[in-house]
Amino acid sequence: MANIASAKKRARQAENNRAHNAALRSRLRTYIKKVILAVDSGDLTKAQEAFRQAVPIIDSSVNKGLIHRNKAARSKSRLNARVKALALQAAS
């Protein structure tokens, strides 16, 4: 454990930041899972709505430094591909 006051403060801040980041990361994963579950259920409108809700959450995670922008782009691309595949499947 730290002995210097500033080190103690940084330890407290690090713990608070860790908890906050964990909550944000959990929210991110939840929204991504909602899209995947909606696609797997075969409900196109539900999947599209879930995707529309997930995109701003993914983008805000990048702005907060939670994930890298390339990971965000990859996640959005893969989710969108799933939704589009469902739309094509529903159309045919």
Swiss-Prot record:
Q: Which GO terms describe its molecular function?
A: small ribosomal subunit rRNA binding; structural constituent of ribosome
- Name the GO terms of the biological process aspect: translation
The GO cellular component terms are:
cytosol; small ribosomal subunit
Q: Which UniProt keywords apply?
A: Ribonucleoprotein, Ribosomal protein, RNA-binding, rRNA-binding
Check the record and name the Pfam families matching this protein.
Ribosomal_S20p
Q: Where is this region: Disordered?
A: 1-20
Family, per entry: Belongs to the bacterial ribosomal protein bS20 family.
Per the entry, what this protein does is: Binds directly to 16S ribosomal RNA.
HAMAP family named in the record: Ribosomal_bS20
Q: What is the name listed in the Swiss-Prot or TrEMBL entry for this protein? A: Small ribosomal subunit protein bS20
